């Protein structure tokens, strides 16, 4: 069986890294911007494979040094697509998704795996997703998006992640998505022993109350204050589980401790809820940094499950078969792209083969206009639309992303 190597970009503190290593990949390179997260990677991986810096800087990552690597993987920044944010997509200086896709055209990895937040699956980004699929198809890859839930892989947390997997044409027939492994344990089942570790008498009763999986762990960003477990809605969900979400504790509850809501979680407890096993990963930095590293990570069990399926495909295990891939995310985008010219409402209807309500056309053009240049022309009888260039950063030297990155680097996480 061949040795499989991965180049991981925007690697964070290593949730995906650990999962991929468990799946049989070894790291050729892991790149991370945050100093503390990079220190965590060095502590747990071979230190010489970790680089700290902006992954889009050629002096940090030279794609030509990694031609034909088995897997290119990463958890590129999520704010451009976050439901909690402005969903700027290609207009967001932090958007590296399109850049990572274009990296495939240079590095020619045998497989690509990128994960992001659920927001990228929303209708707002249908054109963006379609562009990504079409570009990868042009490069010789079969690509597919899939919304996966961490709780389906034993992680005691409500954590949906939107994952893109692409494989070169000869490997694609051997890939299948991982199947759910069964129900996840509750927060109480997961943390009871840690809550009782220092002798707190209330651990048994607390565990009985914490009888569901956790809400999504939110790592947050450097722009906001100390560590806590999320916005108001999440705090209410934590309170129902008997957890005080207003901060992170330094130690488990002590004998005789009484709580109005319940105890706070420690970083070790949060790591368990994210799918880490005790002692298998050491986090560097102060408490707030460690919490953010853990909270922003891709749960290792999910990364491992996907990684094993990618490994099997690259080894051409089993019988190859044609996959039914959902490759049509935005037919209006495709019609405009294939035309390359101005199209009216009626022309678009003929192109997609169905009626298009005026509100649908208006919304789609508005959404496309946030990720692409869209020209409009008021003709004698009807408005016409023409799709222009993609706005996203794909490595262009003169792109505004470079200036904005330098200006706001300390706030990016």
Swiss-Prot record:
GO molecular function annotation: DNA (cytosine-5-)-methyltransferase activity; DNA binding
Domain of life: Bacteria
Keyword S-adenosyl-L-methionine carried by entry: yes
Enzyme Commission identifier(s): 2.1.1.37
Record's catalysed reaction(s): a 2'-deoxycytidine in DNA + S-adenosyl-L-methionine = a 5-methyl-2'-deoxycytidine in DNA + S-adenosyl-L-homocysteine + H(+)
Keyword Ribosomal protein: no
Keywords annotated in UniProt: DNA-binding, Methyltransferase, Restriction system, S-adenosyl-L-methionine, Transferase
One GO BP annotation of this record: negative regulation of gene expression via chromosomal CpG island methylation
Domain SAM-dependent MTase C5-type span(s) in chain numbering: 4-317
Pfam families, A to Z: DNA_methylase (PF00145)
Enzyme active site: 78
Job of this protein: A methylase that recognizes the double-stranded sequence 5'-GCCGGC-3', methylates C-? on both strands, and protects the DNA from cleavage by the NaeI endonuclease.
PANTHER family, A to Z: CYTOSINE-SPECIFIC METHYLTRANSFERASE, DNA (CYTOSINE-5)-METHYLTRANSFERASE 1
Stated family: Belongs to the class I-like SAM-binding methyltransferase superfamily. C5-methyltransferase family.
Protein name: Type II methyltransferase M.NaeI
Source organism per UniProt: Lentzea aerocolonigenes
């Amino acid at each position: 069986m061949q040795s499989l190597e991965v180049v991981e970009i925007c690697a964070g503190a290593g949730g995906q890294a650990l999962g991929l290593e468990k799946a049989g990949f070894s790291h050729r390179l892991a790149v991370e911007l945050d100093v503390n997260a990079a220190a965590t990677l060095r502590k747990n991986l071979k230190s010489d494979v970790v680089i700290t810096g902006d992954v889009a800087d050629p002096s940090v990552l030279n794609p030509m040094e990694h031609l034909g690597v088995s897997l290119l993987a990463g958890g590129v920044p999520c704010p451009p697509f976050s439901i909690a944010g402005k969903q700027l997509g290609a207009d967001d200086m932090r958007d590296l998704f399109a850049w990572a896709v274009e990296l495939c055209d240079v590095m020619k990895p045998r497989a690509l795996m990128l994960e992001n937040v659920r927001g990228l699956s929303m209708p707002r980004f249908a054109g963006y997703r379609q562009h990504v699929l079409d570009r990868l198809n042009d490069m010789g890859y079969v690509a597919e998006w899939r919304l996966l839930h961490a709780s389906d892989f034993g992680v005691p947390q409500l954590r949906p992640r939107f994952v893109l997997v692409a494989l070169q044409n000869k490997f694609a027939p051997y890939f299948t998505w991982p199947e759910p492994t069964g129900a996840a344990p509750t927060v109480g089942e997961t943390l009871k022993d840690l809550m009782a570790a220092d002798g707190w008498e209330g651990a048994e009763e607390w565990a009985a109350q914490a009888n569901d999986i956790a809400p999504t762990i939110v790592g947050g960003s450097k722009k906001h204050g100390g560590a806590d477990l999320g916005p108001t809605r999440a705090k209410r969900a934590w309170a129902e589980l008997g957890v005080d979400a207003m901060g992170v504790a330094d130690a488990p509850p002590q004998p005789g401790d009484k709580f109005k809501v319940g105890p706070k979680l420690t970083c070790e407890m949060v790591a368990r809820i994210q799918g880490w096993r005790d002692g298998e990963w050491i986090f560097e930095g102060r408490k707030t940094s460690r919490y953010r590293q853990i909270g922003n990570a891709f749960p290792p069990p999910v990364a491992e499950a996907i990684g094993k399926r990618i490994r099997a495909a690259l080894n051409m295990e089993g019988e190859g078969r044609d996959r039914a891939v959902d490759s049509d995310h935005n037919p209006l985008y495709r019609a405009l792209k294939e035309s390359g010219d101005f199209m009216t409402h009626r022309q678009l209807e003929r192109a997609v083969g169905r009626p298009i309500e005026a509100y649908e056309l208006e919304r789609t053009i508005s959404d496309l206009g946030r990720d692409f240049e869209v020209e409009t022309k008021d003709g004698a009888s009807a408005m016409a639309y023409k799709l222009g260039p993609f706005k996203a950063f794909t490595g262009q030297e003169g792109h505004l992303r470079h200036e904005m990155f330098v200006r706001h680097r300390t706030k990016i996480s």
